[in-house]
Structures are given as structure tokens and as C-alpha cells.
Swiss-Prot record:
The keyword S-adenosyl-L-methionine applies. This is Ribosomal protein L11 methyltransferase. GO terms for biological process: methylation. GO terms for molecular function: protein methyltransferase activity; protein-lysine N-methyltransferase activity. Coiled coil: none annotated. The gene is prmA. It is found in: Cytoplasm. It is an enzyme of class 2 (transferase). GO terms for cellular component: cytoplasm.
């Protein structure tokens, strides 16, 4: 394997991180890393929630950064033009692209394969759940539940506001003998948290085969046998109903899925929807109510909202 790679750095806002990651995945990217200052700020404000953290990381500037790694071939300039144009157009979709600066650097393979790990330390994200990277040690407290995670470079650290709100909602609404469906399971973090919080059976689905593989690997790290991970669309690959459906995606996808999701939720069950930027919160609430959901609560953290609704 070549030892020298091209690193594309996009300087942006926390709001645009997922959108820009999606842009990179539409190209020939070999790896993606995310540096979100809001993760660092969360750790700064919750010093008791992590076991150890490199003080130098607390000096990270306010700009969020997405880095994509490419081989230098004849397609790279085409990819770069696509990235620049797509980032520039984010404003048209109501997404704050922040600085929107795109830079290219040459880097060694060893640098980008491991540097992203320094941003990821054990973090307590709810009353019970601690997200722990598999390469870190952590002294578990009696009441804590440890989620072992190797997100890989394709996924966030699990400490993003949207993930934290989902986990806190799962902690509140999961009871024993409950079934949970996780739409867009990514690294599997919500599926694993649901199982460890007492769900009897969990099904996670994702359209991305990389996510499916990552979820399955993380389930093995946690020694769980009550989680099923499927590749595809919820409506096409899952049968039956759940007591809770959780989706940490984006507002437009949640709005699109709402009518279909209703058929997969038991009477009295909950739909936990996050990944919703605050400016789109009312649009999601309107669609949920039009579809027959009752809004149970709206959680907000930073620029993001998590909406918990119920089917009676």
C-alpha cells in the first residue's frame, strides 16, 4: 500500500459535519475523520465524565474540521472539484457551512490512520452509559454501563449532542422485554446502548455496508447476542413492530420516513428522532403530528433537537 496520501481538509461548522462527510463518501475517499470542537467543549464542561483527556486538545479552535484521505490518482482533481462545489452549495440547503475552506496536504499513512484516535476518550453520555473506545482503559463505577466502541474513521465518537440525546431518551423509555429498531445504525452505538439498557431484542438497519460491518464488529466487542444488524431500508428488510424506533439521521430523512415508520411501532410505542437542527424542529413536529404521533417531549442541546413522540 502507498505510504503517502492526499488529505483534504474542510473547515466548517459543527452543523455541517454530517453533510460534508456525506459529500466525501460520494467520492473515492479511503477514510474520513471528524474534529468537532463541540465534543471538546463537552469534555471541558464535564470534567468528571471522562477518565483522561489530553490537555492539548482543549486548545482546539472553534472551527470544525472534516478530513478525507485519498490516493493521488487521475480522478483526484475531479473529486476535489466536486467537493469544493458541494461545500459551496450547502447554504442553499439551509446548512451553515462555516468557513467552507477546502485545503489539500500530503500526509503519511501512519499519521492519518491513528491521529484521529487522540480525540476519543471514555466519556459518560448519560446517567448510566459510558462510551469507551476499545483501545482505552477505564475504571467502571458500580452504576455505570460500558459501551465498548471502535467507531473507525467513518463514524463520529458517540459524544455528539444528537447521540447523547438519543441515549438519554433510550435510558428513560426502555423497559424490560421491549423491542427496539435503530434506523441508520452507523457504528451500532444506539443499538448496543439499547440492548445494554435492557431491551429484549434490537434490530439495527443501515443502507451503508461499511456501517453494517462496523455495527456487527462493535456488537462482538460488547458480547451481545440479542442484536440483529441488517443492510437495507427499514421498510424492506424488517418485519414486525417495535416498542421503540430510534433514528439519529437528519430532519429531511425523518420527515420522509415518518409515515412508513408508524406502521412499525406498537400501540403505545415511541419514536425517538434526532439529528434535527433546531431550525427544522417545527417542520418535523408538524409532520409527526399530521401523521398521528403525539409529541411526548422535545430535548435540545446546542444547535440540535431530539423529538420523542408516541403512538396511542
Amino acid at each position: 500500500m502507498d505510504k503517502e496520501w492526499l488529505e483534504v481538509c474542510i473547515y466548517t461548522s459543527s452543523e455541517a459535519l454530517e453533510a460534508i462527510s456525506g459529500i466525501l463518501y460520494n467520492t473515492g475517499v479511503k477514510g474520513v475523520s471528524i474534529e468537532d470542537p463541540k465534543d471538546i467543549e463537552f469534555k471541558r464542561k464535564h470534567p468528571g465524565d471522562w477518565d483522561y483527556f489530553d490537555e492539548t486538545l482543549l486548545k482546539v479552535k472553534d472551527t470544525a474540521i472534516v478530513k478525507g484521505y485519498y490516493k493521488e490518482d487521475d480522478k483526484f482533481n475531479e473529486y476535489l472539484d466536486y467537493i469544493k462545489k458541494s461545500v459551496s452549495n450547502l447554504d442553499q440547503f439551509g446548512i451553515d457551512k462555516g468557513e467552507g475552506l477546502v485545503e489539500v496536504h500530503k500526509v503519511n499513512e501512519e499519521d492519518w490512520e491513528n491521529n484521529w484516535k487522540k480525540y476519543y476518550k471514555p466519556t459518560k453520555v448519560s446517567n448510566k452509559i459510558v462510551i469507551k473506545p476499545i483501545w482505552e482503559n477505564y475504571d467502571k463505577k458500580q452504576e455505570e454501563i460500558i459501551v465498548e466502541l471502535d467507531p473507525g474513521m467513518a463514524f463520529g465518537t458517540g459524544t455528539h449532542e444528537t447521540t447523547r440525546m438519543c441515549i438519554n431518551a433510550l435510558e428513560k423509555y426502555i423497559k424490560e422485554d421491549r423491542t427496539v429498531f435503530d434506523i441508520g445504525c452507523g457504528s451500532g452505538i444506539l443499538s448496543i446502548a439499547a440492548a445494554k439498557l435492557g431491551a429484549k431484542h434490537v434490530i439495527g438497519v443501515d443502507l451503508d455496508p461499511v456501517a453494517v460491518k462496523s455495527s456487527k464488529e462493535n456488537i462482538k466487542y460488547n458480547n451481545l447476542d440479542n442484536i440483529e444488524i441488517l443492510e437495507g431500508n427499514l421498510m424492506e428488510v424488517v418485519e414486525g413492530r417495535a416498542n421503540i424506533v430510534v433514528a439519529n439521521i437528519i430532519a429531511d430523512v425523518i420527515i420522509f420516513l415518518t409515515e412508513g415508520v408508524k406502521a412499525f411501532i406498537e400501540k403505545g410505542g415511541y419514536f425517538i428522532a434526532s439529528g434535527i437542527i433546531n431550525s427544522r424542529k417545527e417542520d418535523v413536529i408538524k409532520k409527526l403530528e399530521e401523521t398521528g404521533f403525539i409529541i411526548e417531549e422535545v430535548r435540545e442541546e446546542g444547535e440540535w433537537a431530539c423529538i420523542v413522540s408516541k403512538i396511542n
